[in-house]
Amino acid sequence: MKTLPDNPHLDHLRQQAKELLAGLRDVDPTATLADAQAALAGQYGFHTWPELKAEVDRMHGQADTADPSLARAVADRFDLGSVAGPMRSLARPDDIGRRWSITTDRGRFTIRTMDTWLPIVDADTDVALQLAAAAAGVLLPTPVRSRDGEVVESVGGHRWRAYHQLPAGPPLAAPVSAAVAGAVGDVLATLHGLALPVDRVSPWHARRLGPASWAGLAATATARQAPWAGLLAAAVPALEDLAAVGRDVPVPDPVLTHNTLGPAQTRLAPDGRLVVVGWEHAGGQPPAWEVANALLDWAVAPHGRVDAVGARALVDGYRRRAGGVPTRCLADFRGAATGLVNYVYEQVEAALAAETTEDRRYADRGVRHLLTHLPTRTTLERLLDAVA
């Protein structure tokens, strides 16, 4: 599920809907802007566009402002310049920490806490990947090291890292236009072509991480009277089937890569180029797995319909850069399926542990959205058929 920023603007949602319309029309040429608005609302976990607009109105102006002394301390540690305005939160905390924006006399920067970061590779390694990707033509916010040369620093009881901020629009929403899908394929081929070594496949994609069985977790949700408990119980067979995708097939060699290159980690620059953010989860994946993951993230429309035009554009973009495409069979979706199963498990546990009314409201909406939008083997097979 997409997450609204802390200070959402309706103009950004309108822009997202217009960009989404291009992808929807590849699936259904009769799609309208109203269809795109409704689809976007669904991606944010709301039933209708008016409900999403009402949430934007409710949240507008609610971004948190950091203590000025903390802003100055972080800016000083990373040598960002003299603080020229309030340091404001950009979004609610995620699985790593929380993103903030700070403006100094040297420009605008995105800084984020790393308090709950579970690294797949160390920060120096992900920065090396970013710099190599940028040198190869990938557009991304340049990471900033501290005065002491560190990527992550402790300031004010939190761990921080910083990036230069690039002018760009809101996060993208799938399905996207063929041009954007092709750019995604090009970025993936560029990263894989770097062939940077890594010692393992990301655990997130390699194996199921949650200790409890799905049936046991569903029973816990029922006992806690979670509003989505029935949906989870009904989804147990689908989740178990996804976890079995490619299980008995040998794992190909991984390369160091972005690892989460979905719509939430991309923006469009003013010139239309793809901006790639969210490198903190960098790690190892076999190229075939990451391309398959991208097809699932980028080429599936609402209600599980496959965007064949977008899927072909993505692999064509990859092929133009790399000379070929590694994804060939259902087993290549193993990483995507395993990662999705782990994500569902994590979100269910977070929803059961949520304490405040606002956190429960957000978590319940997210779990309900996940459980009603799970792909199936049929979805994966249709993606393969689209790019055969």
Per-region residue spans from a language model:
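Active-site acidic catalytic loop and adjacent metal/ATP-binding pocket
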Residues: 95-105, 110-111, 143, 243-289, ...
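ATP-binding pocket architecture of kinase catalytic cores
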Residues: 104-199
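A cross-family kinase active-site recognition segment
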Residues: 174-231, 252-254, 361
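ATP/Mg2+ or Mg2+-diphosphate-binding catalytic cores
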Residues: 221, 343-388
